[in-house]
Swiss-Prot record:
Cell inner membrane as UniProt keyword: no
Species assigned in the record: Mytilus trossulus (Blue mussel)
GO cellular component, one term: nucleus
PTM summary: PL-II* and PL-IV are produced by post-translational cleavage of a common precursor.
Protein name: Sperm-specific protein PHI-2B/PHI-3
GO biological process annotation, one example: spermatogenesis
GO MF annotation, one: DNA binding
């Protein structure tokens, strides 16, 4: 009978000879490609309807069936089963906003029936132009305020020049008036008594 020490040694040798289990390799996750920013978005059903009506150029309006055919022919990847319900919502939205209008021939129609035309949408770019105008006015007001501040100095200089010009011509007039006042009484006082004395001596 083999001793128990030998059995333990044989077991340890068998364990050492057995190949080591390699650790399970972790599966590498393939990185997802980021979606390109600003990718091509699918147009809305209302925009597709407007494009179909403008392309067909029918004065009396385009029917719902003709619009549907044009959308399916010119737009790929559209689910035909959901297109009918999407068109109904788009027609209702377009009539409320004024983008779509019914012609006189289909005035009594309702829902997604009859024919449709493109209406006149409210012009948005005009509002943007009006918003920019106050900036120009503010720059003009600044220039006017700067001119108003500078103008009083010019007026003061003009007033001083006018006063100096007005004072100069007054000085010779005063001297001339004094000279005439002095000369007139002397001539009358001296001449008058001499003539009367000569007449009395002759008698």
């Amino acid at each position: 009978m083999p001793s128990p020490s030998r059995k333990s040694r044989s077991r340890s040798r068998s364990r050492s000879k057995s190949p080591k289990r390699s650790p399970a390799k972790k599966a590498r996750k393939t990185p997802k490609k980021p979606r390109a920013a600003g990718g091509v978005k699918k147009p809305s059903t209302l925009s597709m309807i407007v494009a179909a009506i403008t392309a067909m150029k029918n004065r009396k309006g385009s029917s719902v069936q003709a619009i549907r055919k044009y959308i399916l022919a010119n737009n790929k990847g559209i689910n035909t089963s959901h297109l009918g319900s999407a068109m109904k919502l788009a027609f209702a939205k377009g009539l409320k906003s004024g983008v779509l209008v019914r012609p006189k021939t289909s005035a009594g129609a309702s829902g997604a029936t009859g024919s449709f035309r493109v209406g006149k949408a409210p012009a948005s770019p005009k509002k943007a132009k009006k918003a920019k105008s106050p900036k120009k006015k503010s720059s003009k007001n600044k220039s006017n305020n700067a001119k108003a501040k500078k103008s009083p100095r010019k007026k003061a200089a003009v007033k001083k020049s006018t006063k100096s010009k007005a004072k100069k011509p007054k000085s010779p007039k005063k001297k001339a008036a004094k000279k005439t006042a002095r000369k007139s009484p002397k001539k009358k006082a001296r001449k008058s008594p001499k003539k009367k004395a000569a007449k009395k001596s002759k008698k």
